[in-house]
Regions:
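PLP-dependent aminotransferase-like
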Residues: 101-159
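Conserved PLP-binding catalytic core of the aspartate aminotransferase-like
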Residues: 137, 280-281, 289-324, 340
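PLP-dependent enzyme catalytic core of the Aspartate aminotransferase-like
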Residues: 173, 319-358
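N-terminal "arm"/small-domain region of PLP-dependent enzymes with the aminotransferase-like
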Residues: 1-61
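Active-site pre-lysine segment of PLP-dependent enzymes
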Residues: 124, 141-152, 165-188, 192-225
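Phosphate-binding glycine-rich loop
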Residues: 63-108, 126
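Short beta-strands and strand-loop turn motifs
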Residues: 130-134, 156-162, 188-192, 299-301, ...
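PLP-dependent aminotransferase class I/II
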Residues: 215-292, 296-299
Length: 358
């Protein structure tokens, strides 16, 4: 008897992407905060909202499939040729495109773990084998082990810096050594989704380093610092052959009319954006200092979140957080990632974590 459509056997082994949990409805008057998805607490810049309203009048038309104006804006902002830029529906879409354009059955994709949850998913969807390399005990990438994991079957390497969820960075020296050790036919993606929040001068500079390598791409997003998570826009910067491969695997008309206009407008007011990012970085410092003053172990972060390596206490802390009106991101048996959010949310988090550790 026909039981319905037959799907690829490999799908049974692929976990679904698990997004940050939304707060449960409350009836006790306590304001609930979602600090589980690394979202920007600020709304889009005023001029961006205006552009969104204007663009809404044109959604009866297909968007520019080549995102020409947005690509021009990104190229000017980054100081790179337009031929070095590809855009897509969020950085995660580009992760899919990198996997689809480089790897298939019998191939391997290497990445640190724990890191961005999409890496093993996009690898498996492409039919390739994920190779997860454990982080160091301090939450940093083990770059020597990452290089050692590259074999003749490796087609793609993801490096997340600042790393999600630990907030640690790969240094320029580490990246240079890694690129020198990896064959130039292996694609390396430096995922800089949180780079605007980084203040570590030793952190790898993707936009400088990619110019020296045909096989290095830089991945960025408008979801975090720019506060456009709901519009889904990400971009990659790499040499033209890489961009051509990404464009061949892109979803046609993927970036909407509104998303293209809003992202381009977001690049036009650097001063206000920097002020907002600086405010979040200052809050990150305040939160980190408050936690450490209370004896809470917290990893030094260069992103818009902090990581508590709670181990077996993770679930208990997540449950207490939920009860207190804070929905955090828990990774069972490992730790909790908490977004730097509104001041009230940050204050509640400091108090909760302090009480928990005490």
């Amino acid at each position: 008897m026909n039981s319905g459509p037959r799907f690829r056997d490999a799908l049974q082994e692929i976990p679904g992407y698990r997004a940050g949990k939304r707060p449960d409805p409350r009836t006790d008057g306590v304001e609930a905060f979602k600090v589980s998805s690394n979202e920007n607490p600020y709304p889009p810049l005023p001029q961006v909202v205006k552009v969104i309203e204007q663009a809404a009048h044109h959604v009866n038309r297909y968007p520019d499939p080549g995102s020409a104006e947005l690509i021009e804006a990104i190229a000017a902002h980054a100081g790179v040729p337009r031929e070095h830029v590809a855009v897509a529906t969020g950085a995660v879409a580009l992760c899919y495109q990198f996997a689809q354009s480089t790897a298939g059955p019998g191939d391997e994709v290497v990445f640190a773990w724990r890191s961005f949850e999409a890496y093993p998913i996009v690898t498996s969807v492409a039919g390739a084998q994920p190779v997860a390399v454990p982080l160091l005990a301090d939450g940093h990438h083990d770059m020597a082990a990452l290089a050692a994991a590259v074999t003749d079957r490796t087609r793609l390497v993801f490096i997340c810096s600042p790393n999600n969820p630990t907030g640690t960075v790969v240094t320029q020296d580490e990246l240079d050594e890694f690129m020198a050790a990896v064959p130039n036919d292996v694609m390396v993606v430096l995922d800089e989704a949180y780079i605007e929040f980084c203040r570590d001068p030793s952190a790898a500079a993707g936009l400088v380093t990619y110019t020296k390598h045909q096989n290095l791409a830089v991945l960025r997003t408008f979801s975090k610092a720019y506060g456009l998570a709901g519009l889904r826009v990400g971009y990659a910067i790499a040499q033209p052959p890489v961009i051509e491969a990404l464009n061949k695997t892109a979803l046609p008309f993927g970036v909407s009319v509104i998303a293209q206009a809003a992202a381009a407008a977001s690049l036009a007011d650097d001063a206000e954006l920097r002020a907002r990012v600086d405010a979040l970085v200052a809050e990150r410092t305040r939160v980190t200092q408050g936690l450490r003053a209370a004896g809470v172990e917290v990893v030094s972060s260069e992103a818009n979140f902090v990581w508590l390596p709670l181990g077996e206490q993770t679930e208990e802390f997540a449950n207490r957080s939920e009860q207190a009106g804070l929905t955090v991101r828990a990774f069972a048996g490992e730790g909790v990632r908490v977004t730097i959010a509104e001041t009230a949310a940050n204050d509640r988090f400091i108090g909760l974590a302090s009480d928990f550790s005490g």
